[in-house]
Amino acid sequence: MVRNYPFFMFPIHYQFSIIHYPLKKEMKLNLKNPIVFFDLETTGTNINTDRIVEICYLKVYPNGNEETKTMRINPEMHIPEASSAVHGIYDADVADCPTFKEVAKNVARDIEGCDLAGFNSNRFDIPVLAEEFLRAGVDIDMTKRKFVDVQVIFHKMEQRTLSAAYKFY
């Protein structure tokens, strides 16, 4: 069971892949715990009913070591065309992949003792991941970790003006 999990409403999923953008070596993170930057691709945007079709992460240890992993997941349900159009993953691509239940214990072990981070992760990725753990019957404690939503940081750091948008685009 997932304990003390912060639920959020009205998720919005943004296409984002962290694996293609590793941390710069000159970037110094002062980490107490390892942090896992992760992204999910899913069958849709409903936290309660949609399923993971891909999980990828970059795990950064306090000593600076990094490890990455990408897994395709059979969601055991049809992937709607609209979702496939976003992430490019179709039913045939995951037909022979393991289900989340089959990999849940390994994923839980990979993120054990880690803080979690991602883009829009507090509103979408973390709730979806928690729901998948619940369905798989894997107990994971979400109370002893920090959640870092890069989207929140981005919105605080970037100017939200017409002039800034003009310069950006």
Which residues does each PLM region occupy?
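Arg/Gly-rich low-complexity intrinsically disordered repeat tracts
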Residues: 5, 11-22
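Conserved non-catalytic scaffold segment of RNase H-like nuclease domains
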Residues: 24-144, 159-169
